[in-house]
A protein has these predicted regions:
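Membrane-interfacial loop-to-transmembrane alpha-helix junctions, especially the N-terminal start
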Residues: 8, 29-45, 69-74, 95-106, ...
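Interfacial loop-to-transmembrane junctions
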Residues: 149-172
C-alpha cells in the first residue's frame, strides 16, 4: 500500500517537472529548447515512469482480500482504453486536432488515479464518500484537461502557452488532494 502512495507522490513530482519543462521550453514568443528544459523533461519522464511502476506495484502487491467491493480494476482500464480510442477518433477525424501524446497522458492519468482511489476504497483506506468525491474531482480535471487539449491549436500561441499549463497544474493539485486525503484517513 505504501508503494501506491509513494508512486502517487512521484506523479506529483512528474507533473512539476513537466510544468517546468513546458514553461521553459514554450515560453512566448516562440518555442526554444534549452539544456534546463531538456533536464526537466527527462526528470519528468523518469519520475513519471517510476511513479507508475510504484503505483501499479502497490495496487498489485496488497496481501489479503479487499474489505469492500469496488469496481473491477480491469473494467476501469478497459473504460480508459475505449475512451482513448473514441477521443482519438473524435479529436483527430471529426475535430481535426493534431494527435499528440497529451491525449494518452490525460487518459492514462485518469485511469491511474481512478484505479488508485478504487484500490484505497476497497482496502478500507478511504471512506466511500471520500473516494467518490475524489473520483468526481479526477473526472472533472480530466474533462478540463481535454478541453484545454482541444483548444490548444485553435488559439494564439500566447494563450496556448497558458492553456497548455492548465492540465499540468490541475493534475498536480488533484493528486496532492488525493494524497492528503489518504494521509488524513490514517490519522
Amino acid at each position: 500500500m505504501k508503494l501506491l502512495e509513494i508512486g502517487n507522490w512521484m506523479m506529483v513530482v512528474c507533473a512539476g517537472f513537466y510544468l517546468a519543462w513546458w514553461r521553459i521550453t514554450f515560453r512566448p514568443p516562440a518555442p526554444e529548447g534549452t539544456p534546463l528544459g531538456n533536464i526537466c523533461i527527462i526528470l519528468a519522464l523518469i519520475s513519471g515512469i517510476l511513479g507508475i511502476i510504484l503505483a501499479v506495484a502497490g495496487m498489485n502487491g496488497t496481501s489479503g482480500e479487499p474489505v469492500r467491493a469496488g469496481f473491477p480494476g480491469l473494467g476501469i482500464v478497459a473504460g480508459g482504453a475505449v475512451s482513448y480510442v473514441l477521443l482519438l477518433v473524435l479529436s483527430s477525424m471529426a475535430l481535426h486536432r493534431q494527435v499528440t501524446s497529451e491525449l494518452l497522458i490525460i487518459i492514462g492519468w485518469t485511469v491511474l488515479e481512478l484505479c488508485a482511489l478504487n484500490h484505497w476504497f476497497q482496502n478500507g483506506r478511504l471512506a466511500q464518500w471520500v473516494a467518490v468525491l475524489m473520483a468526481v474531482i479526477v473526472i472533472l480535471a480530466a474533462i478540463a484537461s481535454l478541453v484545454c487539449y482541444m483548444l490548444y491549436y485553435r488559439v494564439s500561441y500566447e494563450l496556448g502557452y497558458l492553456i497548455g499549463s492548465v492540465p499540468l497544474v490541475l493534475t498536480a493539485v488533484v493528486m496532492i488532494l488525493i494524497n492528503l486525503a489518504v494521509i488524513a484517513a490514517r490519522i
